[in-house]
Amino acid sequence: MIVAFVSGNCSIGKTTVACNLAYLLKDTFDVSFFDCDIEKTDATVFLPSKWIEEKEIVISVPKIDRSQCNHCLNCVRICQFGVFLDFKNTIITLPERCAGCGYCSSFCTRHAIDYKPFVLGTIKKGSYKNLTVIESRINSTAVKADSLLFNTHSLLNPLGLNVVDCAPLISEYHFCSALDPDFFVIVTNGSFVEIKNFLAIVQQIQEMNRPFGIVINKAKTEKSFIEDYCQNNNLPILGILPFEEDVVSGKTSAYKLVTYSDKWQALYKNLWQRILEEVSQ
């Protein structure tokens, strides 16, 4: 089973919620935690892992043999990722945009396109207590994460529970959606300012025809705008996690919330039960 955690903004507490659920279930299931917040991997702050494997993901990106290039512009026209630029009658390549498909060279009549290696990112595999932890981190200059995704996908445990912490913001959701999650957990703080991104996430997941539910994190005592919206539009609320000063100020380690008090453990147990209920429908 694959459960993906997504959010519309940074600093919502998505990683905290995902890590706590994985930590709660580590002794009950064979849990693998995937930190797929590829531009800003930070789950190890909560799950300080001992790494046992590290793999560089290398793709082949084009380079131009200028002695052979006749400036036909076939490469510029055929590449949908904008790797090739025509600048003052010279073809410039942007390797950080490349997906490594190799399509461009088949359209070069002069055989002027060769390839060179480019480090797209790294994948680390380790453990923390009973958890398997995988971290996917993209090169800071890279734009396309496809090959990083394919290599991450191969590490999913088909017989266990895979908890995936996705990158915030809609532009990155293709990365986690391509992992084909069984269930999406949308983490929100319930505020009005987040409604635009929240609605866009809901629409994308509905178009994928995947079950999902909403967790309202850092909830205040009064009813939030998004809570009202969910109830009025029959969107399932999985849980409401309260705002507590001790948690926000760091007086308790975030990954130990499920052991911090019986109250927090019960909240996360209820969250897991609600996920199972929604998946089974």
Question: Where are the language model's segments positioned?
Answer:
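Ferredoxin-like iron-sulfur electron-transfer modules
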Residues: 21, 25, 48-71, 82-100, ...
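Short beta-strand-centered segment that lines the nucleotide-binding/catalytic pocket of NTP-utilizing
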Residues: 29-44, 117-123
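Switch II (G3) loop of P-loop NTPases
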Residues: 36-37, 135-144, 149-174
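C-terminal lobe/tail of nucleotide-utilizing enzymes
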Residues: 3, 204-281
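Inter-motif core of Ras-like GTPase G domains
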Residues: 171-192, 198
